[in-house]
Amino acid sequence: MEGVEDDLSKLLEELSSGVVLNNIQEKLNQSSPKLQSFIDDETGSNAEDVRRVLDAATDTESNYGGGANSITNTPNFNSHRGHQHLQLHTELSLDALRPVSENSPLHKSATRPISTSIRLPRLSVCEDDSSSSSSSSDGDSNSSSDSSDNSSEQSDDDDVHLHLHLHRHHRKVKEDEGDSFESSSESSEQYGSPSTLRRQEALKLEKIMQIQEKKKLLKEKLKEQDELELKEKQELNEITVQKEIKLKDKSNSVQNDIVDSDNNNNNNNNNSITIEEQQQEKQQQQQQHHHHHSTPNKPPKSRSVSISTPDSNIVVAGGNVISKERKRSILASFEEGSPMRSSSRLPSSRGGSIKIKVSKVLEEEMQLQQEFEKQEQLRHSARLSQLIRDLNMSSNLQDQQDQQLRKNENSNNNEGDDNNENVSNDNSSDNENQNINGSILIKEEQQEKIEITTTITTVITPPPPAQEPQHQQQPKILTPEEVEEERIRVLRIERMKDQVFSQLDELEDPLYSNGSRQRNGGGGGASTSAEPSMMQIPLTRLEDTASSSSSPTLQATKTTTTTTTTTTTTTTATLPINNKNLNIQGRPRKDSISDHWDIGRKEQPRRSMTLNIQRVGEDFSVKKAEAKKVNPDLEKILVHISLVDQSHKVICITEDFTVKDVIDLFSEKLGLVQTEFFSLAEVTSDGYDRWLDPNRAVKEAGIKNLSKLTFKIKYFKQPKKLSDSKAVHLYYLQIQQSVVNGTYPCSEAMSYRLSALQFYITFGAFDKDKHIAGFLDHGSLSEFIPSNFFFELTDEVIQKRLFHLHSQIKCSSSIEAKLRYLDLANKIPTFGVTSFQVFDGIRESSIVRQKRHLCVAEDGILISRKDRAGYDFFSYKEIISYQVTTRGLKIQIPHSSITPNTSETMSFDTSSYDQSNNIIDLMMGYKYFIQHDEFIRGIGAPVEQVDLNISLLLPLFQPPKIRTKSDPLRSRLELFKLNYLGLCQNFHTKPISKLIDQIDYILDKEGSFRNRLAFEKVELPSLNLRGSDLSFIADALKDTLNLIIEEGESIVENLNILSLDLSNNPLLATDAFEPLKIIMTCNTIIHLNLKNIGLSNKGVMPLVTIIEKYPNIETLQIGKNRVNESGVRVILRAIKNFNVKIETLGFEETNLTDSGCLIIDKLLSNNKTIKNLNISKNLITEEGFHHIFEGIKRNSLSLQDLNISGNKINSKLMIKFIKWLASSETSIITLNIAKTGLESSFGAELQKFLVGNSCHIKSLDTSYNDLGTSGTKNVIKGIINNQTITELSLCANKISSSGCNDLCQSLELASATCSKLYLRHCGLGSSSLVRIANMLELNKTITTLDLSMNEFSKSSSSAIGTMLEKNETLQEFYLADSSLGAREVESILNGLKNNSTIKKIFLDTNPIGKKGISSLANMLNTNTGLEVITLRHTNLNGKDILELLKQLSTNIPIKIINLTENTLDKITPQIKNAINDQIKRLHTINIQY
């Protein structure tokens, strides 16, 4: 028993592995059951050989009870006749004889064997035309001779008792002899050459008429034999009843769980085909004992296998027996190379049998069919053998226990010894082996399911002592505790078996595994035993035929019943049509879309807020309906049904199907339960749907063989309850396709958010390493983004935005993402409409017709406008009438509802009459829904004369939602973007990507619409823009801002441009009016930066006009332009006279002279709002600064930032200015007096100002003056005692070691406030640099340090490296032009490895060279905080750069590496390509070289 548990545990482990999963999970789509598959599975051989034996034994009865229908060899299953027979023929597929479409599943390119795709008329193999005519008569004569031979060999085998009963339903004969002949002729004409097949039919009919008399004689003989056998059985029943009365009192417990095939035979009195291998009297006695559930002490062991029908039980073929020699010859023919395996059988869909030459069947198809059959048989044999082995292990153990119990009880039961002694003596040689009495019931029901019932009765008697092996121990008497322990162990093994088969179910088909697992627990099959030892083993999916769909199932129930003298094991199996465990040929296909549908089994259920979609518990609560089955007697029709995403299935139907039956069958294939929301449509030639009436028959609806249909929603309304996960998925699919193809036009922001959800559903959660630009190609990207949003943008730009939104999605499962998708899409104004392209009935010209879109919705119709985007909506209450015309349709509306794009009577031309009817049909259907809703609310009359199909749908939907005219994510900013991209596309101009990025950042920022974020800054500096590039921006702004919002519409106002930065674009001077045109268009701009745009005196006047027209400008930067003094004076004069809100003026490098300073003096005096004044790097002398000084005195309270650097002002006037600052109350906090000719004496006055109480300076720049060491030391002393300065620049002023020490001491104090320190080119020695490094180890305030252009030594570099390991505040570090070689840099980089606070480091103009590459790469791969590093002019060539990039890892945090200005003149194309490849590899880093 422990070995069984170990084997089952190993089997469970193997089933959980990926290898087993890949081997088992193959989906076979098969069309009909085959007797061949069962025989192959049970015997491990080919069913073709068995059919030859059956033909030989039973061909004489082939048409027994057939009546007139025997002329076509069609069995007549007439219940009034006592006999029936199913003749088995060797058949080949006819698919090879007819050309098929390349898209058809029957095409030879498909991997599925063609012969299994449809059930076709039977084909008998013949060698040539001459022999085909005589094969029928030969076959009949041969079968008769074989039958007689089998009769003579009846006694050759006494061990096996084989009953073959072919189950078939009663079918009334619908065709007379003539009809059957016509059916056979039609089959011949359809599938073969007409002349040849008619000749064969004539010969065939002639032969059939000649043997009719023979068959009648055989029928009479069989009838007599059946009556004799029935009489004998009735006598035996009487004897058995008497025996039962005697044995019933002595039996301790009697079980009622045995399936008695003979009892069924006696009750039904039906036909059967029995081939007996043992004497009939012994077999009947054995069955009588089974019937009364008791057996004598020493019964014989027997094995019987019977194939019977519920309404036939008469022995056919005179009780013929297959001899051992005959069986050996049959088994020998089952070898792999046997020629009998060259064909396969398909159930006939017509009555007749058609004979064709084998040579006419395509060899390619036959080879493919044979190869697939062998592979399937090997796979099935390996799987089934393991299951049977485990089943037998448990059965043998239980039988041994029962044998011991029965042996102990036999001593008390002596009355039955006499009755069974003879039988026991006859079979004493078989006592050591277990004989099986099985009856295999094969039954073809209306669901076309084959039910196989195997009753295994094992009767074990204690062997005589002389025959007991020496090594066998004496049976031990088990105590009740031991019996209970063994029972518990058996139950544990049974549960493990259930887990094994449940795992097999899930591996075979995940769609049915859940339902199968639930139903397996409830029992089923033929056994009704209540014993605890009963176990149910689902060999395949167990399907409840009463309430669920007739999916392929194979059910086995093993019941073990222990009595005083008998052990009976009953196994009932239900063989399905499409059982994957059986050797049935099928098409190995790719996984369909339904295999990947997420049914949303999550702990936290989600409920859609709009479509009332909900889950119950862990799953959707649904019930499956039963689908109609294919009628094998009717012509088969293949139907190609696709979903809206172009995934499809091919199903087989018959002519008796209605459209509703087709929907149910297709839904069963998909696992769909709530079918009431979906309909079938046929796509017409004009691209629109022709909806099929579900109550019509398929031929009336126009469904033909290989018709292509679409399965989708017709009436798109909000369902009251949608509880089927597959229905949710189909809703999602149709909406998603409508969004992508533009049927539901929506805003770009809405579209991208829906696309991000779709991407999440398709590819899962965001992965920053996987989901990057380039993940999707253009074709795949078009399946997510509507085509009208591509414009001239690259795929990388679109994917970058898509992945950004994808990263914001927080969903627990894909089903939740689908529900969010439906909720968001429900806000689209055109949600749920069916769109039709029509044309205006009134043409504007004889050639051009105006295209319009007419959309039918649940509450009215929408008609697209002529002059602009959008729709005019008319509710059904507004519409007076609508009708179909010869050219299309006509719609009449009241005069009050007329819009500029519509008229009182609107005529539209359609592409076809069917399209017009389709539109009217949808409108009428939606009106019925509205009338029903009004009637329910009590405000309308009941609906009269409503279509039956619509009446069934009325209670399923909610009332129409309130229609909105606008998308909630439609915004002014998006409209500006679309207008700009449209202009660029029309004029074939590349859009400015930086502008698009800035717009998308606002649109896609999380919570942007909820928080009402606005687009306020247009920052386009340093892009080498031209005037024409800006003209599109100006035009788009004009169109956007001038858009008038109609009544009932809404738009998010998120476009409010306040700042325009066009600096450092010198090419704009070619057309200076264009940048100014933007300002004139958008009157909200108050901050204007036009620095270095090439503005000359010609462009001054438009700027002056803007200043005069828009007096609210607060910031004006026009520095570094080619405006001379006259132009500056004109601008300043305009500001002085018209602007009263100016705060910032920038006139650096504008050639401003002393005369211009007079205007600045007046401007400062009159305008009290100026806070920032920059007049640096001009031609101002002492006289000009004197005017400015006077103006500052009058505006001392408002001016905060003064930059007069780069002007030749002598030291005396500056000392006077500093003294005034020290003695006056001013607001100046930023003072830049760099490069103004200051001398060392200025240092003392500056020290006094810095230590005074009136000093509020926060930023002081005295760079590039001639202060000397003494003047600089005085400035440092003033800074030491100052508590306000946070930014200090002493660049290009010599600092002594003592001054440096004093500065470091003040910065080491806890009260230090300086955060930015610039000591560039200050002549610092090695000791001073070491001192600064030691200071930085203690300082907690400095974030920016510039030590560039100071010569570093090894010791100072090592000190800097040590400092970097300890410092935790420094963020920007400048070490440019510091004579740092490879060794010095290595010391600094070693300290930088473990520093996580520095974000930027500048190592430009240092001779690092090739030797420093490894240390650089090592630092970059190790550091976790560095974002920017500059290595300009560092003696690196192309090979060095390539080597550096190769050593870099892809997951480093750095963002920018600047390698420009290195010697790359002699770089080869190979190295350049290699560098580009590395840059692609390091795509997350902006590498500049």
Curated annotation (Swiss-Prot):
Q: Which Gene Ontology CC terms are recorded? A: cytoplasm; cytoskeleton; plasma membrane
Basic residues bias spans: 163-172
Coiled-coil stretches: 202-289, 356-383
What's an example GO BP annotation here? Answer: cell-cell adhesion
> Composition bias, kind Low complexity: at what positions?
131-153, 181-195, 277-287, 421-435, 556-569
- LRR repeat coordinates: 1017-1040, 1053-1075, 1087-1110, 1111-1133, 1167-1191, 1196-1219, 1254-1278, 1282-1306, 1339-1362, 1367-1391, 1395-1418, 1428-1450, 1451-1474
UniProtKB keywords? Coiled coil, Leucine-rich repeat, Repeat
Polar residues bias spans: 59-79, 103-118, 303-312, 545-555
Where's the FERM domain? Answer: 637-934
Query: What species does this protein belong to?
Result: Dictyostelium discoideum
- Which gene carries the instructions for this protein? frmC
Q: What is this protein called?
A: FERM domain-containing protein C
Upper classification of the source organism reads: Eukaryota, Amoebozoa, Evosea, Eumycetozoa, Dictyostelia
Q: Which domain of life is it from?
A: Eukaryota
Against Pfam families, the record matches this protein to:
FERM_M (PF00373), FERM_N (PF09379)
Region: Disordered, residue numbers: 59-86, 103-197, 252-271, 277-312, 396-435, 459-479, 508-569
